UniProtKB/Swiss-Prot annotation:
The keyword Lyase does not apply. Keywords: Cytoplasm, Nucleus, Oxidoreductase. Its main location: cytoplasm. Gene3D superfamilies: Medium-chain alcohol dehydrogenases, catalytic domain, NAD(P)-binding Rossmann-like Domain. This is Zinc-type alcohol dehydrogenase-like protein PB24D3.08c. Belongs to the zinc-containing alcohol dehydrogenase family. Quinone oxidoreductase subfamily. One of its GO terms (cellular component) is nucleus. SMART domains: PKS_ER (SM00829). It comes from the Eukaryota. GO terms for molecular function: oxidoreductase activity, acting on the CH-CH group of donors, NAD or NADP as acceptor. The keyword Nucleus applies. Its EC number is 1.-.-.-. It is found in: Cytoplasm; Nucleus.
Amino acid sequence: MVSNNAVIIKKYLDSTAGYPVIGEHLAFEKREFDLENAQVDEETPVLLKNIYTSVDPYLRMRMQSPKHASYIPPLELGKPFYNSTVAKVVKSTLDQYKPGMDVVFVSGWEEYTFVSKQALGFLQPINNPYKLPLIDFVGSLGMPSQTAYCGLKHIGKPKAGETIYISAASGAVGQMAGQLAKAMGLHVVGSVGSDEKFKICLDSGYDSVFNYKKESPFKALPRLCPKGIDIYFENVGGETMDAVLENMNLQGRIIFCGAISQYNNPNPYRVKNLGMVLVKSLTIQGFIVANILPQYQEQYFEEMPKLIAEGKIKYKCDVYDGLESAPEAFIGMLQGKNSGKTIVKIADE
């Protein structure tokens, strides 16, 4: 027998009810697994050993009860969280997934996961011509980076010389959006919530950064964007949007990626300046990366691994060691304690 420990959801928590509590809403659970006698068959043809898993804000929305479900169904009570994960094939009945193969899968926060035949479409072998570290496939090449890339291309439609403002600028999406925007010839401004994050952004190429805990966006944006804002990459929500709307240029584009400041807020902020959308002919568009990634996936994997291998893209990750640390990693990320992309290392490679 081996361990197959997991992090499970114990109780739903709606978005206005505050932050999840370890032990009440999610918990680390010790389990055993008979690996030697585990069978793969027609219904579950692949068994994976999970190595690295991604920790992302959208999982908070999966903790809402079914009556308040978001764009994605809630997690099933008593079952593991699951998200994009680097894993290794342990057993397989299929020639295209041989034991020892490295893959990316939407896998459970557990040590071992069976893949059903219905889920095989999500099981992607890792193509790694530049010999990048495996962690990069949930880090610098993972879903948040894909989100930054697709959001900029699909909604931002950037033109060299324009100004882009990115909130949560050192986060999983923000740090990649900033570097990509800079490579596209934009003037890049970001906001963060700590001096450490401030430095991370400057080191990664941002032209200007401000700490919103020290300076209001209503004061900082006119100072740092004297020519106005052409593109806003929205990651935080709240009053920042009102400050942005005051400073947007005509026909500006707002990429609505997330609103992490509101996910656990019992009194959600209501935007007051929506009239500016009409007056300035603005475009505000939300998006789910899974819906538009197919249009950009081939281009993304042609461009991004090479840029990372050449050191032209820097990407900071906060890596937690051991599955038992996942609840702390998740809640810390929601509270803004992370200074980069949050990842949990489940096992050695």
